[in-house]
Amino acid sequence: MVENPTWFAVLCASIPIAFFIAFIFLPESPAYLMSQGKYHEAKAALRYFRGIDNDIDSEIKSLKEYIRNAAKNRVTFKELFKTRGTIKALVVSFGLMIFQQMSGIYPILFYAKDIFEDFSVKLNPGATIILGFCLVSSTYFSTMLLKVARRRVLLLVSFSMMALSLGGLGVYYHMKESSSSPSNTWIPLFTFCIFITFYAAGVGPIPWLMLREIFPPNVTRRATAITAGFHWFLAFGVTKLYQNLVDFMHTGWTLGHFAILCIIGSIFVYFFVPETKGRTLEEIHDDFDGIHRKKKHRHVIEVESLSEA
C-alpha cells in the first residue's frame, strides 16, 4: 500500500488531519486570551492546563498585570531592532536556529539512504524509517524531560552528544576507507539513532520553546515570524548544499564539519543563552534589558507553563 503514491499521500495527510481535529478541542493560550481582553476565557484556559485543584488566581493577576504593561507599546518589525532587550533576544533565537540547522539534522534525515550506502551499510532501504521512529519517540519523551530539566543543561548535553556522534561517524568512515574498520554494519545506524535522540531531547524543541520565553508578549508574534522564516531559509540552504559538500569533501569530512559546528553551538549556548526554566517573563526580559532588580518573595509564573499553554 505504501508503495502506491496515492495511498502514500493519503497516509501522510492523515497526520496533519489528526492534528487539525485535535486542535479544535485545544483551548487558546491564556496569555493570548488575556492580551485580547478575554479575562474569563483566559482563566478557564489556565485552569484547564493547571488542573481544577490548583489555585490560579495569583498567577492570573500577575499575568494580567504583566501583559497590560508589555502591551502599552506595540512594535512594528522595524522597531524590533530599536531596543537592547529585543536585539539580544533576536541574537539568541537566531543563534539557536543557526546551530540547530548547522548540526545537519535535515540532510541526515533526507539523505539517510545515501549516507548508509557511503558507509557500506547493507540494509533494506526501508530500514531508514528507524531514524524517523527515533525522532518521533524521542520527541515524545522530551516533552516530559522539559518539565524537569533546565534548558541550558539540555542544550549543552544535546549539542555535545550530537557532536560526539557525528565525530565518531566521521572517524568510522575514514577507518572504513582505510580498510581497518570493524565489519559491524550496525554501528552507523546505532550512532545516527543516538544523534537523532539527543537532537530531539534538546536542540530540536528548545529553540522553538524559547521563542515564547525570551520575547515580551507584544513582540512575540513578529519575532517568531522573523525567526521561523530565518529557520526554514537555513533548512533549505543546508539541505540544498549538503550534496555539494559531500562531493567536495566526502561524507566523513562533511559529518566532521557538522560535529565541529555542534561544538561551536554548545559554546554559544554556554556564553549567550540564558536559563529560562523557573523564571518569570519579567526576570528574563530584565536580563536582556540589563536591568537588575532585588529578589522578592513573590508568586512565580514559570515560563514553561505559559509556553505550554
Residue ranges and their predicted role:
Residues 1-49, 68-309:
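Alpha-helical transmembrane bundle of multi-pass membrane proteins
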Residues 56-68:
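Short, well-structured alpha-helical segments
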